[in-house]
Amino acid sequence: MLIIGLADCNHGTETALHLMAKNIVAETLKVFVPYVPKTEYDFSNQGRIITFEKAEMEKALSSSVRGDIILYSGSSYLNIEIKVTHEVDLEKTIELFNLGIPTIEVDLSDIKSDFTPEIIAERLLAATHIRLIHSPKTKEYFARRILGEWKKTTNNSNGTHVKDCPLSRKNAYFVDYCRKGGKNECHNCDAYIRYMNDHSVFDEAMFLCYGCLDGIDFGKIEKILHLKKDENHIHSVKLLMADGSVVERGISE
């Protein structure tokens, strides 16, 4: 007697969903491509459905990275990652950054066993379930996103600040917050990237900040050679710059 466990069923569903999504992309050659932001303050929700010319599945992008499906149009191409259970992790994001591979991720993780080709095809054209992983057009923007730290916020009469700011100075009340260049609020700091008040992601409001890497020109980062980073803290980083120099930072624990 053949007994199939729940784990086997889940794996089978995952495999079928993943394969169906790739086949639909290969057949239709269409996918929604998000707008490529130029800066952290570029909040446009625009994007568009693009029709490509050909597709290639499971293509090796490097010795360690394989794309789910690549779409081609002339000399341009787009790598598509299908998320069923696992999203593109930090290690792969860095690989894609270093290789300069334009990549999007299609999120199918909420779709269970009752899916149809029509449901998947619709999802592939919907902005709400597709995120931009990397675009070489705005490399500086993505370098900041990879190297930024999520920091908890605190509020006082001077505004909203991160706790334990890496650029902090002690004020008269011995409260740590950034006063870089005379600016005394995170929103006005050069190291501020973005604000997140989504309690489904974090328990409290957070800032994405790169103050720990103050002085590095993000626009000249060629490759991220090493990054030791936990959820909210960078411990060490090694960067190859455009002029061939290497910048290393060991950040205190």
Question: Each predicted region: which residue ranges?
Answer:
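Functionally engaged cysteine thiol sites
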Residues: 9, 13, 41, 189
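Short, flexible, glycine/charge-rich loop motifs used to bind or transfer phosphoryl groups or to couple energy/partner
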Residues: 68-69, 94, 179
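N-terminal cysteine/histidine-rich coordination modules
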Residues: 1-27
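Non-catalytic C-terminal interaction segments of nucleic acid-processing enzymes
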Residues: 102-104, 109-253
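A short, charged
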Residues: 25-32, 112-117
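Active-site metal-binding core of divalent-cation-utilizing nuclease and nuclease-like domains
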Residues: 33-83
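Short amphipathic alpha-helical segments with coiled-coil-like heptad repeat character
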Residues: 7-13, 88-90, 197
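Basic, amphipathic alpha-helical patches used to engage nucleic acids or provide basic targeting signals
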Residues: 77-119
